[in-house]
């Protein structure tokens, strides 16, 4: 229980010998207990510290909570998922699994591995700020490319593919 002094001290002791610390709270979740990146970095300069939140650590929505289905909608994925408008069951739908959570975890692994590789060179850890929304939007690169090339916004096409299946 990191809200208690004993729990905070335990986290500090663990951080001294840790390679990576991952937090997945609203902004300031660990910081308010003296367990933020700067505090942990003083204990272990080689620590890679990853913060996952809905909207990132700064910006107008940073303090807001978020969850997978909400991020799928805000990130544009729901606008592409499901049957086309005007067809039975048409309209935006969420993906059947927590795909925004999963893809954020995949980006987290890539970021951590890159930071660990850099640490081998520099001897220093890094801070990684990763948001569910940013990683969700990044997965829409093909739709963005299609829009930039054609000027047509992407639409829901059911199981069809906008570039392969006519």
What function would you assign to each model-found segment?
Residues 1-42:
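A structured beta-alpha segment of the ubiquitous adenosine-cofactor-binding alpha/beta core
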Residues 22, 40, 49, 68, ...:
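Structural scaffold positions in well-ordered secondary structure
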Residues 27-81:
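Rossmann-fold NAD(P)-binding glycine/threonine-rich loop
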Residues 74-166:
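Acidic, glycine-rich segments within the central catalytic cores of soluble metabolic enzymes
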């Amino acid at each position: 229980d990191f809200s208690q002094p004993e729990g905070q001290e335990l986290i500090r002791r663990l951080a001294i010998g840790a390679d990576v610390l991952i937090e997945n709270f609203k902004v300031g979740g660990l910081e308010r207990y003296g367990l933020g990146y700067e505090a942990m970095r003083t204990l272990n300069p080689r620590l890679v510290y990853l913060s996952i939140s809905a909207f990132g650590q700064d910006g107008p929505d940073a303090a807001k909570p978020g969850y997978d289905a909400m991020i799928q909608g805000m990130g544009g994925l729901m606008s592409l998922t499901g049957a086309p408008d005007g067809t039975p069951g048409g309209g935006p739908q969420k993906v059947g699994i927590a795909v925004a959570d999963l893809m954020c975890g995949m980006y987290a692994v890539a970021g951590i591995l890159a930071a660990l590789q850099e640490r081998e060179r520099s001897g220093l850890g890094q801070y990684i700020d990763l948001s569910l929304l940013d990683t969700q939007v990044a997965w829409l690169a093909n739709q963005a490319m299609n829009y930039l090339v054609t000027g047509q916004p992407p639409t829901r096409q059911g199981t069809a593919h906008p570039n392969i299946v006519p």
